[in-house]
Curated annotation (Swiss-Prot):
It comes from Dothistroma septosporum (strain NZE10 / CBS 128990). The gene is Est1. Belongs to the 'GDXG' lipolytic enzyme family. It comes from the Eukaryota. Its EC number is 3.1.1.94. The keyword Transcription regulation does not apply. Pathway: Mycotoxin biosynthesis. Induction: Expression is positively regulated by the dothistromin-specific transcription factor aflR. Gene3D superfamilies: alpha/beta hydrolase. This is Versiconal hemiacetal acetate esterase. Versiconal hemiacetal acetate esterase; part of the fragmented gene cluster that mediates the biosynthesis of dothistromin (DOTH), a polyketide toxin very similar in structure to the aflatoxin precursor, versicolorin B. The first step of the pathway is the conversion of acetate to norsolorinic acid (NOR) and requires the fatty acid synthase subunits hexA and hexB, as well as the polyketide synthase pksA. PksA combines a hexanoyl starter unit and 7 malonyl-CoA extender units to synthesize the precursor NOR.
Length: 328
Protein backbone atom coordinates (compact mmCIF):
# COMPACT_ATOMS: atom_id res chain seq x y z
CA UNK A 1 0.00 0.00 0.00
CA UNK A 2 1.16 3.57 -0.59
CA UNK A 3 3.01 5.36 2.17
CA UNK A 4 3.06 9.09 2.92
CA UNK A 5 3.39 12.11 0.69
CA UNK A 6 6.73 13.88 0.71
CA UNK A 7 6.57 16.94 2.97
CA UNK A 8 7.85 19.09 0.12
CA UNK A 9 4.79 18.15 -1.92
CA UNK A 10 2.40 18.86 0.94
CA UNK A 11 4.09 22.23 1.41
CA UNK A 12 3.55 23.04 -2.27
CA UNK A 13 -0.13 22.15 -2.02
CA UNK A 14 -0.52 24.36 1.03
CA UNK A 15 1.16 27.28 -0.75
CA UNK A 16 -0.83 26.84 -3.96
CA UNK A 17 -4.27 26.66 -2.40
CA UNK A 18 -4.90 22.95 -2.27
CA UNK A 19 -4.87 19.81 -4.36
CA UNK A 20 -5.54 19.91 -8.10
CA UNK A 21 -6.74 16.86 -10.06
CA UNK A 22 -7.56 16.93 -13.77
CA UNK A 23 -11.23 15.90 -13.97
CA UNK A 24 -14.30 16.92 -15.95
CA UNK A 25 -15.15 17.45 -19.58
CA UNK A 26 -12.39 18.01 -22.15
CA UNK A 27 -13.09 21.76 -22.06
CA UNK A 28 -12.87 21.79 -18.26
CA UNK A 29 -9.63 19.81 -18.28
CA UNK A 30 -8.13 22.08 -20.93
CA UNK A 31 -9.09 25.14 -18.84
CA UNK A 32 -7.59 23.62 -15.67
CA UNK A 33 -4.39 22.76 -17.52
CA UNK A 34 -4.12 26.24 -19.02
CA UNK A 35 -4.61 27.77 -15.57
CA UNK A 36 -1.92 25.56 -14.05
CA UNK A 37 0.49 26.39 -16.87
CA UNK A 38 -0.05 30.12 -16.36
CA UNK A 39 0.41 29.81 -12.59
CA UNK A 40 3.71 27.97 -13.03
CA UNK A 41 5.25 30.34 -15.58
CA UNK A 42 6.64 32.83 -13.03
CA UNK A 43 8.34 29.97 -11.15
CA UNK A 44 10.10 28.54 -14.19
CA UNK A 45 13.84 29.09 -14.68
CA UNK A 46 14.88 31.01 -17.80
CA UNK A 47 15.45 29.10 -21.02
CA UNK A 48 19.14 28.47 -21.70
CA UNK A 49 20.94 31.06 -23.82
CA UNK A 50 23.21 28.25 -25.02
CA UNK A 51 20.51 26.45 -27.00
CA UNK A 52 19.18 27.39 -30.44
CA UNK A 53 15.53 26.64 -31.23
CA UNK A 54 14.04 26.32 -34.71
CA UNK A 55 10.48 25.47 -35.73
CA UNK A 56 8.81 23.82 -38.69
CA UNK A 57 6.08 21.41 -39.64
CA UNK A 58 5.55 18.16 -41.49
CA UNK A 59 2.20 18.19 -43.30
CA UNK A 60 0.87 20.60 -40.69
CA UNK A 61 2.27 18.73 -37.66
CA UNK A 62 4.46 21.30 -35.90
CA UNK A 63 7.83 20.56 -34.34
CA UNK A 64 10.66 22.37 -32.59
CA UNK A 65 14.33 21.46 -32.80
CA UNK A 66 16.72 22.25 -29.93
CA UNK A 67 20.48 22.24 -30.45
CA UNK A 68 23.42 23.38 -28.36
CA UNK A 69 25.08 26.41 -29.95
CA UNK A 70 28.38 25.59 -31.61
CA UNK A 71 27.69 21.85 -31.92
CA UNK A 72 27.99 20.81 -35.55
CA UNK A 73 27.10 17.16 -35.07
CA UNK A 74 26.08 14.66 -36.06
CA UNK A 75 24.48 14.37 -32.62
CA UNK A 76 22.15 11.76 -31.09
CA UNK A 77 18.50 12.64 -31.70
CA UNK A 78 16.07 12.80 -28.78
CA UNK A 79 12.54 12.52 -30.17
CA UNK A 80 10.19 14.06 -27.58
CA UNK A 81 6.43 13.59 -27.24
CA UNK A 82 4.74 15.67 -24.53
CA UNK A 83 2.32 14.46 -21.87
CA UNK A 84 -1.26 15.53 -21.17
CA UNK A 85 -3.48 12.48 -21.61
CA UNK A 86 -3.41 13.04 -25.40
CA UNK A 87 -5.93 15.81 -24.55
CA UNK A 88 -3.81 18.78 -23.41
CA UNK A 89 -0.28 20.03 -23.94
CA UNK A 90 1.69 21.51 -26.81
CA UNK A 91 5.24 22.43 -27.80
CA UNK A 92 5.58 24.56 -24.67
CA UNK A 93 4.83 21.69 -22.27
CA UNK A 94 8.37 20.28 -22.36
CA UNK A 95 10.08 23.38 -23.79
CA UNK A 96 12.39 23.98 -20.82
CA UNK A 97 13.17 20.29 -20.41
CA UNK A 98 14.01 19.93 -24.11
CA UNK A 99 16.47 22.79 -23.72
CA UNK A 100 18.07 21.17 -20.68
CA UNK A 101 18.45 17.87 -22.55
CA UNK A 102 19.97 19.59 -25.58
CA UNK A 103 22.44 21.52 -23.43
CA UNK A 104 23.52 18.82 -21.03
CA UNK A 105 23.47 15.60 -23.09
CA UNK A 106 24.68 17.00 -26.42
CA UNK A 107 21.59 15.63 -28.10
CA UNK A 108 19.59 17.46 -30.73
CA UNK A 109 15.98 17.35 -29.54
CA UNK A 110 12.96 17.11 -31.83
CA UNK A 111 9.78 18.11 -29.95
CA UNK A 112 6.45 17.17 -31.58
CA UNK A 113 3.04 18.88 -31.45
CA UNK A 114 0.75 15.95 -32.29
CA UNK A 115 -3.00 16.50 -32.56
CA UNK A 116 -5.15 16.10 -29.44
CA UNK A 117 -8.41 14.54 -28.32
CA UNK A 118 -11.34 15.04 -28.47
CA UNK A 119 -10.73 16.60 -31.92
CA UNK A 120 -9.06 13.34 -32.96
CA UNK A 121 -8.93 9.85 -31.48
CA UNK A 122 -6.29 7.15 -31.37
CA UNK A 123 -4.18 6.29 -33.28
CA UNK A 124 -3.88 9.85 -34.68
CA UNK A 125 -1.42 11.08 -31.97
CA UNK A 126 0.82 8.10 -32.77
CA UNK A 127 0.47 8.55 -36.53
CA UNK A 128 1.33 12.26 -36.27
CA UNK A 129 4.39 11.47 -34.16
CA UNK A 130 5.56 8.74 -36.55
CA UNK A 131 5.21 11.14 -39.48
CA UNK A 132 7.58 13.63 -37.84
CA UNK A 133 9.93 10.84 -36.69
CA UNK A 134 10.26 9.57 -40.27
CA UNK A 135 10.86 13.10 -41.50
CA UNK A 136 13.57 13.56 -38.87
CA UNK A 137 15.24 10.29 -39.85
CA UNK A 138 15.27 11.27 -43.53
CA UNK A 139 16.45 14.83 -42.88
CA UNK A 140 18.74 14.38 -39.86
CA UNK A 141 21.78 15.86 -41.60
CA UNK A 142 19.89 19.13 -42.15
CA UNK A 143 19.76 19.79 -38.39
CA UNK A 144 22.96 18.10 -37.23
CA UNK A 145 21.37 14.85 -36.12
CA UNK A 146 22.65 11.30 -36.45
CA UNK A 147 19.91 9.05 -37.91
CA UNK A 148 21.67 6.02 -36.42
CA UNK A 149 21.39 7.37 -32.85
CA UNK A 150 17.72 8.04 -32.16
CA UNK A 151 16.05 7.69 -28.80
CA UNK A 152 12.41 8.41 -27.99
CA UNK A 153 11.46 10.29 -24.84
CA UNK A 154 8.22 11.38 -23.21
CA UNK A 155 6.20 11.57 -20.01
CA UNK A 156 2.75 10.14 -19.23
CA UNK A 157 0.82 10.04 -22.52
CA UNK A 158 4.10 11.10 -24.11
CA UNK A 159 5.82 8.19 -22.37
CA UNK A 160 3.21 5.90 -23.86
CA UNK A 161 4.00 7.42 -27.26
CA UNK A 162 7.75 6.96 -26.74
CA UNK A 163 7.14 3.23 -26.29
CA UNK A 164 4.53 3.06 -29.06
CA UNK A 165 6.90 4.74 -31.52
CA UNK A 166 9.64 2.30 -30.55
CA UNK A 167 7.29 -0.63 -31.07
CA UNK A 168 6.44 0.62 -34.57
CA UNK A 169 9.93 1.69 -35.61
CA UNK A 170 11.46 -1.62 -34.52
CA UNK A 171 9.19 -3.30 -37.09
CA UNK A 172 10.34 -0.99 -39.91
CA UNK A 173 13.19 -2.57 -41.92
CA UNK A 174 14.60 0.81 -42.98
CA UNK A 175 14.43 2.54 -39.59
CA UNK A 176 14.73 -0.16 -36.92
CA UNK A 177 18.52 -0.05 -36.58
CA UNK A 178 18.58 3.70 -35.98
CA UNK A 179 16.50 3.58 -32.78
CA UNK A 180 18.87 2.99 -29.88
CA UNK A 181 16.90 3.88 -26.75
CA UNK A 182 13.64 4.78 -25.02
CA UNK A 183 13.10 7.18 -22.11
CA UNK A 184 9.64 6.39 -20.69
CA UNK A 185 8.67 8.72 -17.84
CA UNK A 186 5.54 7.69 -15.89
CA UNK A 187 4.18 6.05 -19.07
CA UNK A 188 0.84 4.37 -19.77
CA UNK A 189 1.67 0.84 -20.93
CA UNK A 190 -1.49 -1.19 -20.29
CA UNK A 191 -5.22 -0.83 -19.66
CA UNK A 192 -6.62 -2.20 -16.41
CA UNK A 193 -9.20 -4.17 -18.39
CA UNK A 194 -6.52 -6.09 -20.29
CA UNK A 195 -3.58 -6.63 -17.93
CA UNK A 196 -1.93 -9.98 -18.76
CA UNK A 197 -2.57 -12.59 -16.09
CA UNK A 198 1.06 -12.87 -15.05
CA UNK A 199 1.20 -9.16 -14.18
CA UNK A 200 -2.15 -8.74 -12.41
CA UNK A 201 -0.69 -9.27 -8.94
CA UNK A 202 1.80 -6.45 -9.58
CA UNK A 203 -0.72 -4.04 -11.09
CA UNK A 204 -2.30 -2.31 -8.08
CA UNK A 205 -1.60 1.39 -8.58
CA UNK A 206 -4.75 2.20 -10.51
CA UNK A 207 -6.79 1.06 -7.48
CA UNK A 208 -4.38 2.44 -4.88
CA UNK A 209 -4.61 5.84 -6.60
CA UNK A 210 -8.14 5.68 -7.99
CA UNK A 211 -9.38 8.94 -6.47
CA UNK A 212 -7.96 12.07 -4.91
CA UNK A 213 -4.25 11.81 -5.66
CA UNK A 214 -2.70 14.96 -7.17
CA UNK A 215 -2.58 15.95 -10.85
CA UNK A 216 -4.22 12.76 -12.17
CA UNK A 217 -5.92 9.80 -10.52
CA UNK A 218 -7.55 6.65 -11.85
CA UNK A 219 -10.70 8.57 -12.72
CA UNK A 220 -8.60 10.98 -14.79
CA UNK A 221 -7.24 8.05 -16.78
CA UNK A 222 -10.78 6.83 -17.44
CA UNK A 223 -11.54 10.23 -18.97
CA UNK A 224 -8.38 10.29 -21.09
CA UNK A 225 -8.91 6.75 -22.37
CA UNK A 226 -12.58 7.47 -23.11
CA UNK A 227 -11.89 10.46 -25.34
CA UNK A 228 -8.89 8.84 -27.00
CA UNK A 229 -11.22 5.92 -27.85
CA UNK A 230 -8.47 3.42 -27.12
CA UNK A 231 -8.88 -0.31 -27.56
CA UNK A 232 -7.70 -1.93 -24.28
CA UNK A 233 -6.43 -4.98 -26.17
CA UNK A 234 -4.45 -3.10 -28.85
CA UNK A 235 -0.69 -3.76 -28.54
CA UNK A 236 0.12 -0.73 -30.70
CA UNK A 237 -1.46 1.47 -28.01
CA UNK A 238 -0.62 -0.56 -24.90
CA UNK A 239 2.91 -1.80 -25.47
CA UNK A 240 2.91 -4.25 -22.55
CA UNK A 241 0.80 -6.38 -24.90
CA UNK A 242 3.34 -6.20 -27.76
CA UNK A 243 5.06 -9.31 -26.40
CA UNK A 244 6.28 -10.62 -29.75
CA UNK A 245 8.29 -7.43 -30.28
CA UNK A 246 9.66 -6.84 -26.77
CA UNK A 247 12.93 -8.60 -27.57
CA UNK A 248 13.60 -5.99 -30.26
CA UNK A 249 13.20 -2.98 -27.96
CA UNK A 250 16.32 -0.91 -27.28
CA UNK A 251 17.64 -0.12 -23.78
CA UNK A 252 14.85 1.62 -21.87
CA UNK A 253 14.92 4.06 -18.94
CA UNK A 254 11.83 4.36 -16.73
CA UNK A 255 10.68 6.81 -14.08
CA UNK A 256 7.70 6.17 -11.78
CA UNK A 257 5.97 7.91 -8.87
CA UNK A 258 4.30 6.42 -5.80
CA UNK A 259 1.01 8.37 -5.82
CA UNK A 260 0.29 7.79 -9.49
CA UNK A 261 -2.33 5.56 -11.14
CA UNK A 262 0.35 4.77 -13.76
CA UNK A 263 3.00 3.75 -11.21
CA UNK A 264 2.79 0.06 -11.99
CA UNK A 265 2.62 0.62 -15.75
CA UNK A 266 6.34 1.34 -15.57
CA UNK A 267 7.07 -1.65 -13.34
CA UNK A 268 5.20 -4.24 -15.43
CA UNK A 269 6.63 -2.91 -18.70
CA UNK A 270 10.12 -3.03 -17.24
CA UNK A 271 9.52 -6.62 -16.08
CA UNK A 272 8.35 -7.60 -19.57
CA UNK A 273 11.37 -6.03 -21.26
CA UNK A 274 13.77 -7.60 -18.77
CA UNK A 275 12.20 -10.99 -19.44
CA UNK A 276 12.86 -10.39 -23.15
CA UNK A 277 16.52 -9.57 -22.44
CA UNK A 278 16.32 -5.79 -22.84
CA UNK A 279 18.56 -3.66 -20.58
CA UNK A 280 16.56 -1.32 -18.34
CA UNK A 281 17.14 1.37 -15.73
CA UNK A 282 14.44 2.71 -13.39
CA UNK A 283 14.21 5.63 -10.97
CA UNK A 284 11.23 5.62 -8.58
CA UNK A 285 10.03 8.63 -6.59
CA UNK A 286 8.38 7.65 -3.29
CA UNK A 287 6.01 10.18 -1.77
CA UNK A 288 5.49 12.00 -5.07
CA UNK A 289 2.53 12.19 -7.49
CA UNK A 290 2.34 11.83 -11.25
CA UNK A 291 4.51 14.25 -13.24
CA UNK A 292 5.52 16.17 -10.10
CA UNK A 293 8.50 17.78 -11.88
CA UNK A 294 6.06 20.19 -13.52
CA UNK A 295 6.40 22.14 -10.27
CA UNK A 296 9.92 23.63 -10.43
CA UNK A 297 9.93 24.84 -6.82
CA UNK A 298 9.55 21.33 -5.37
CA UNK A 299 13.12 20.20 -4.51
CA UNK A 300 12.55 16.72 -5.91
CA UNK A 301 12.08 18.27 -9.36
CA UNK A 302 15.78 19.13 -9.44
CA UNK A 303 16.61 15.57 -8.39
CA UNK A 304 14.34 14.28 -11.16
CA UNK A 305 16.17 16.34 -13.80
CA UNK A 306 19.56 15.17 -12.52
CA UNK A 307 18.41 11.55 -12.62
CA UNK A 308 16.89 12.02 -16.06
CA UNK A 309 20.17 13.34 -17.44
CA UNK A 310 21.96 10.35 -15.91
CA UNK A 311 19.33 8.05 -17.42
CA UNK A 312 19.85 9.59 -20.85
CA UNK A 313 23.59 9.28 -20.32
CA UNK A 314 23.06 5.58 -19.63
CA UNK A 315 21.11 5.27 -22.90
CA UNK A 316 23.76 7.16 -24.86
CA UNK A 317 26.63 5.17 -23.35
CA UNK A 318 25.26 1.98 -24.90
CA UNK A 319 25.17 3.36 -28.42
CA UNK A 320 27.87 1.99 -30.70
CA UNK A 321 31.11 3.90 -30.41
CA UNK A 322 29.89 5.98 -27.46
CA UNK A 323 31.07 6.41 -23.92
CA UNK A 324 29.01 8.01 -21.19
CA UNK A 325 31.59 10.78 -20.78
CA UNK A 326 31.14 11.69 -24.45
CA UNK A 327 27.74 13.15 -23.66
CA UNK A 328 27.41 14.19 -20.01
Amino acid sequence: MPGQYAQSWLDWEAQSGGRSVLHGTPDEIKAMYAGLSQALKPMAPPFSENVDVTEGDVDGIKYRIYKLKGERGPLPIAFNTHGGGWMVGDLDTDHLLCGVIAEHTKSVVVNVDYRLTPDVAYPVPLEDSLKVYKWAAANASSFGGDPDKFYTIGGSAGGALALQIANKIKKDPQLKDGLKGVVALVPATTHWEAVPEKYKSKYKAVEDNKTGVPIIDGESMEIFFKYAKVDPSDPDTFTLLAEDNHKNFPPTYFASCEFDPLRDDAYVMEAALKEAGVPTKHDHYPGMPHYFWLIPTVPESKIFVENLLQGIGWILSQMKGATRSSYI
